[in-house]
């Protein structure tokens, strides 16, 4: 019964996030998602744990001095079949850190498309659990994901790492996943919105391209729209749910440009949508329209440096892969109590005005394990 109630509340919360007025209230609207600051107030022991853990993530690896008795088993279910390289880099950096820690492991990887492959993800979860892994790395974006996760929590094993979400669910406070890990969608979107709205002069027409109706899109798109709503001379003229389909984003952009030739901005909720919108802008010679990316992966950085994108929130990507490996190391050392509930990595604003040397510096830091330097 409790599981059904939390599923219903999660569904209501997604609707509320879509209708949110103020971004600071989005995670509290139905008292389901707990923003990081609020969580730290409820759990005063967490700031010290998070600071200590972050120091471990930033520091060089400290290899185990004695080999473990057996390999750890890690099952990964990722919606990685998309243009963004976030998931691929997360996996590569986690594996690189595990090797540096001399922590032997077996890995089973299950990939899918975001939004549309929920049934496949459910089958992948069943297969993964039959393998009896020590760790399951998954995500939470839709109501079906919630059902899958509550099944794992009810089983009591494996240890569950929820990636790409840094706002714990209130319903799970007494039975939390092992770790929430990723980058704060609200924080990153605020960086983008502050820059875009100022460049637009806080006036004009804009459109929104939604990746899906899930949690991530609601956090990103809802935050941008809430910040834009503070300025009465800004008008959202179109809002498209694309189901994660770049072709839908491309066609929606073309249609909006035709119907609103004075369009000033496009807020894109993901890398795939940003690149699709960019294709439409180039084809119509409308590169004057402001366009953002989200995440700052390799494809976005290339588009930004080529003059296509105007701004992005760049994740220091590999930190979240390192964080997962370091959490496993602490468990191996029987120090699980030193693992915080949340790891939220750093995000940097990158714009068309950012000097190339600064972008190179951020790239080396963000991709330090997933994109090793060329020794040639």
What are these regions (language model features)?
Residues 29-70, 319-376:
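Hinge/cleft segment of the Venus flytrap/periplasmic-binding protein
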Residues 143-144, 148-187, 298-305, 310:
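Flexible loop/hinge segments that line or gate small-molecule binding clefts
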Residues 99-117, 205-210, 225-247:
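Short beta-strand elements in bilobed, periplasmic/extracellular small-molecule ligand-binding domains
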Residues 54-63, 73-93, 101, 110-119, ...:
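Extracytoplasmic "Venus flytrap"
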Residues 106-130, 239-259, 274-275:
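Structural motif
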Residues 135-155, 224, 242-302:
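Hydrophobic alpha-helical
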Residues 74-76, 94, 190-239, 328, ...:
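An alpha-beta-alpha
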Residues 179-204, 249-250, 297-300, 316-333:
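Hydrophobic alpha-helical segments within soluble ligand-binding/sensing domains
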């Amino acid at each position: 019964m409790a599981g059904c109630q939390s599923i219903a509340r999660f569904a209501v919360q997604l609707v509320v996030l879509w209708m949110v007025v103020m971004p600071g209230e989005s995670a509290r609207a139905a008292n389901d998602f707990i923003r990081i600051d609020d969580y730290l107030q409820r759990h005063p022991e967490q700031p010290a744990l998070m600071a200590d853990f972050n120091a471990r993530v930033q520091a060089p690896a400290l290899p185990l001095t004695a080999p473990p008795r057996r390999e750890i088993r890690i099952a990964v279910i990722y919606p990685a079949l998309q243009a963004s390289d976030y998931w691929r880099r997360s996996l590569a950096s986690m594996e690189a850190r595990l090797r540096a820690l001399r922590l032997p492991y077996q890995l089973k990887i299950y990939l899918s498309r975001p939004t549309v492959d929920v049934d496949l993800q459910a089958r992948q979860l069943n297969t993964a659990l039959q393998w009896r892994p020590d760790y399951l790395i998954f995500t939470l974006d839709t109501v079906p994901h919630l059902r899958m996760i509550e099944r794992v929590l009810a089983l009591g094993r494996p240890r569950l790492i929820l990636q790409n979400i840094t706002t714990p669910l209130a319903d799970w406070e007494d039975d939390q996943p092992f770790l929430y890990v990723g980058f704060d969608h609200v924080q990153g979107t605020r960086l983008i919105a502050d820059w875009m709205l100022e460049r637009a002069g806080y006036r004009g027409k804009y459109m929104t391209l939604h990746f899906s109706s899930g949690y991530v899109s609601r956090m990103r798109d809802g935050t941008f729209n809430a910040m834009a709503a503070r300025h009465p001379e800004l008008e959202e003229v179109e809002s498209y749910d694309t189901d994660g389909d770049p072709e839908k984003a491309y066609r929606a952009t073309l249609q909006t440009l035709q119907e609103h030739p004075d369009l000033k901005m496009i807020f894109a909720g993901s890398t795939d949508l940003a690149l699709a919108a960019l294709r439409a802008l180039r084809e119509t010679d409308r590169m004057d329209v402001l366009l953002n990316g989200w995440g700052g992966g390799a494809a976005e950085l290339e588009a930004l440096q080529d003059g296509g994108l105007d701004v992005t929130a760049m994740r220091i990507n590999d930190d979240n892969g390192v964080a997962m490996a370091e959490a496993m190391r602490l468990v191996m050392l029987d120090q699980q109590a030193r693992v915080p509930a949340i790891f939220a990595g750093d995000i940097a604003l990158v714009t068309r005005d950012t000097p190339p040397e600064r972008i190179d510096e951020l790239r080396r830091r963000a991709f330090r394990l997933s994109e090793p330097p060329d020794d040639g």
